[in-house]
Amino acid sequence: MKVLFISLGCDKNLADSEEMLGLLTGNGHEIVDSEEEADAIVINTCCFIHDAKEESVNTILEMAEYKKAGTCKALIVTGCMAQRYKEEITEEIPEVDAVLGTTSYGDIVKALNEAEAGHVFHEFRDINDLPEDSGRRVITTGGHFGYLKIAEGCDKHCTYCIIPSLRGKFRSVPEERLLKQAEYMASQGVRELILVAQETTVYGTDLYGKKTLHILLKKLCQVKGIRWIRVLYCYPEEIYDELIQVMKEEKKICHYLDLPIQHASDRILKRMGRRTSKAQLVGIITKLRREIPDIVLRTSLITGFPGETEEDHQELMEFVDEMEFDRLGVFTYSPEEGTPAETMEGQVPEELKEERRDEIMELQQEISLEKGTDRIGQELLVMIEGKVSGESAYIGRTYGDAPKVDGYMFVQTGELLVTGDFAKVKVTGAMEYDLIGELADEYTE
C-alpha cells in the first residue's frame, strides 16, 4: 500500500515514527508525501499540552475526510493521544480503523493489514514494555543528524505532567542495542547523534543499578562516522561528576546540555513536584561553567503555573537575568486532565501567562543577542544544513545549536558546500538568536 505518515510532537515521538516507517517499508509498503495518493494514512500523535492535543485532533479530523471520500482505505492513529483516549478516538471518529498505544508501534504492519481487511484493530501493550527495534529505521531528518532514544518512560511524576501515565516507568534501552542502532544510523549518513529520552541523565539506573550515561557516551564516541554527540533532556539534579568528566575528555561530545529547570522560585518548584531548589540550580550551573568553560546551556521554563504570584515571576526574571542561559524556551502552563496541578488553587489567567512569557522572552532576546555579539571574530565549526534559496549563502549549526529549537549560522559564501559536511566559519555578525559568518581562510579539515 501507499502510506502517508504524519509524525506530530517531540523528537522522541519522531524516533518512534522512524521505527514504524522501517517496519512498513521492510514489509513492502511505499511511503508517499501527499494525502491524495495515499491508500493509508498513519498519524503518530502528541497530547503533552493543550496545543499539541488540538493539533492531533485537527489532523485526525482532516485526514478522516480522505477516508470519507474513499481515497484512503485505512486510517491509523498511534502515540500519546491514542494511549490516552483509546476508546474516545474510535467512538467519536468512526473513520479511524486502528489505534495503537505508545508501546505497541511494533504492531503497525499488523494494524495496517487488519484495517485493509476492513477490521477495527486496537493494540495496547503494557506501558512498561520496551518495544523492539525495527532493525531498519528510516531517518527522516535529512540524514545528517538523527535522534537516538536511550530510554522510555519517567519516574519523576511532576505535578503538571501526564507523561508517566502514557509512557510508563523509566526503563533504559540496553547498551548493546543502542550501539547497534548508532552504527546503523552512521551507515545511513548520520553525522550528529542526538540522545533523547524523557530524562537522559538517569540512564542505566534500572539496568545496572547506577547511572551509566557516561559509559554509554564513551562507547558511542567509538562509532565510526559519528562526528558530534549531543545530549538533551538532562534533569539538573541528576548531573554527576563522571558525566562532566567524559564531556571534557571526549572530543565528539558537544559542550552543550539541555537542562529543563521549569522555574526558579522554591515555592513554585515544590508545587511542581520538582526535586531541586534555586540554590541547587545555581550550584549546578556554576559547576558546569567552571568545569567546561565553553559549555552552551539550554533550558525551558513554565510560566503561569497555579499559584504563581508576581513575586514568583519577578524571582524567575531575576534568575534568568543572573544565570544568562545561552538558549531558553518558555511554555505557558497548560492544565492537563488527571494531573495534580489541574485542580490546584490559584489558576493564572491565560492573558497573564502570556504576558509573563513575553517578558521572559524579551529579556532572553537581549541576553542571546549579547552572547551572539561576543562571538564576533571567533572561528566555529559549523555543520551545513542546506543552501539559502536564491542567495550565495548556507544555513548551518554550531555545537551550541540543537536542531529545530535553537538558532542557525548563516554562512555567506560563493563556495559549494554539501549538506552534512563541516566547515570552519568566522563569525561576522549576530542577530537575536542567529549568527552570521563567512568561511574561514582554511575552512575545510
Which stretches of residues belong to each language-model region?
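Proteins enriched for Cys/Gly/acidic motifs involved in redox and nucleic-acid/cofactor modification
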Residues: 1-203, 242, 253, 257, ...
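Radical SAM enzyme [4Fe-4S]-AdoMet core and its adjacent flexible, acidic
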Residues: 10, 204-221, 225, 271-275, ...
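Conserved SAM/AdoMet-binding glycine-rich loop
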Residues: 74-76, 84, 89, 187-311, ...
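Short, hinge-like loop/turn segments at secondary-structure boundaries
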Residues: 93-94, 115-118, 211-213, 247-248, ...
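Conserved, mostly hydrophobic/aromatic
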Residues: 178, 195, 231, 259, ...
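Active-site proximal loops enriched in glycine and acidic residues that flank catalytic Cys/His/Asp
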Residues: 197, 233, 261-263, 299-303, ...
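Short beta-alpha junctions and helix-cap segments that line functional grooves
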Residues: 243-244, 316, 411-413
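Terminal RNA-binding accessory module
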Residues: 343-445
